[in-house]
UniProtKB/Swiss-Prot annotation:
Species the sequence originates in: Shigella flexneri
Name this protein carries in UniProt: Fructoselysine 6-kinase
SUPFAM superfamilies, per the entry: Ribokinase-like (SSF53613)
Family classification: Belongs to the carbohydrate kinase PfkB family.
First-level EC class: transferase
Classification via Pfam families: PfkB (PF00294)
Gene3D superfamilies, alphabetized: 3.40.1190.20
Described function: Catalyzes the ATP-dependent phosphorylation of fructoselysine to fructoselysine 6-phosphate. May function in a fructoselysine degradation pathway that allows S.flexneri to grow on fructoselysine or psicoselysine.
Keyword Zinc-finger: no
Biological or metabolic pathway of the protein: Carbohydrate metabolism; fructoselysine degradation; D-glucose 6-phosphate and lysine from fructoselysine: step 1/2
Keywords from the named record: ATP-binding, Kinase, Nucleotide-binding, Transferase
UniProt keyword annotation of Iron-sulfur present: no
Gene (name only): frlD
Length: 261
């Protein structure tokens, strides 16, 4: 079996201030960051038949991701305008392009059979795949980002081994939410807290991980890096706190340069 495949969103992040464009998106980023740990992840996503689509596929292949199921569709590749304010990213206009109609084919499902872990995020139009993937014995992971009001918290979590999210800081309200998520059926919930580290609830106890002290250049990809480091650590047999520490180290590396990768 192969370690991990991601499904769903891709996006070209366009930085007008830098006059540069970087390939990204949660599914793409997590796959790329997993290559840091010596594995070849797979990725299922849709790109347009434009220059950005060509760039994204070339970038993924260069980084060591299996692009056999990065499908090219007629239309525009997803893209986001990004500005930097005090080294933090601020998202501007977003064009979803061909990703608006994303769905897995039967052939995509068959291809995923070779992977142990499948990950997606809330923007990827991939949530409908998770009941089938979980029932097939895949370890499933999903990133809700900061969308705490999403109805997917009610419907999707019984099909998740790991539910990831983000919040500004830990407080009692957050801890209660995390307990409720696991009670609803998720295996473990992990919340990244930016400069405040991360916290996990596994149904028995809370686990906390402090951030690594580094010079921040660009926070793009920090959360995706954490997820990749965590999942690769878990698949290698790490404990929950060990996997959180590896996720933190992966994120610390990413935030020290411009762009996701």
């Amino acid at each position: 079996m192969k370690t991990l495949a991601t499904i769903g969103d891709n996006c070209v992040d366009i930085y007008p201030q830098l006059n540069k464009a970087f390939s990204g998106g949660n599914a793409v980023n997590v796959a790329v960051y997993c290559t840091r740990y010596g594995i070849q992840p797979g990725c299922i996503t849709w790109v347009g038949d434009d220059d950005y689509g060509t760039k994204l596929k070339q970038d993924l292949a260069r980084m060591g991701v299996d692009i056999s199921h990065v499908h090219t569709k007629h239309g525009v590749t997803a893209q986001t305008q990004v500005e930097l304010h005090d080294n933090d990213r601020v998202f501007g206009d977003y064009t979803e392009g061909v990703m608006a109609d994303f769905a897995l084919s039967e052939e995509d499902y068959a291809w995923l059979a070779q992977y142990d872990i499948v990950h997606a995020a809330i923007w990827g139009h991939a949530e409908d795949a998770f009941p089938q993937l979980h029932a097939a014995g895949k370890l499933t992971a999903f990133d809700f980002s900061d969308k705490w009001d999403s109805p997917l918290w009610q419907t999707l979590v019984p099909h998740l081994d790991f539910a990831f999210a983000s919040a500004p800081q830990e407080d009692e309200a957050l801890r209660l939410k995390m307990k409720a998520i696991v009670a609803r059926g998720a295996g473990t919930v992990i919340v990244t807290l930016g400069e405040n580290g991360s916290i996990a609830w596994d149904g028995a106890q809370f686990w906390r991980q402090a951030p690594e002290p580094v010079t921040v250049i660009d926070t793009m990809g920090a959360g995706d890096s954490f997820i990749a480091g965590f999942l690769c650590g878990w698949s290698a047999g790490m404990t929950l706190p060990q996997a959180m520490a590896q996720g933190t180290a992966c994120a610390a590396k990413t935030i020290q340069y411009h762009g996701a990768w």
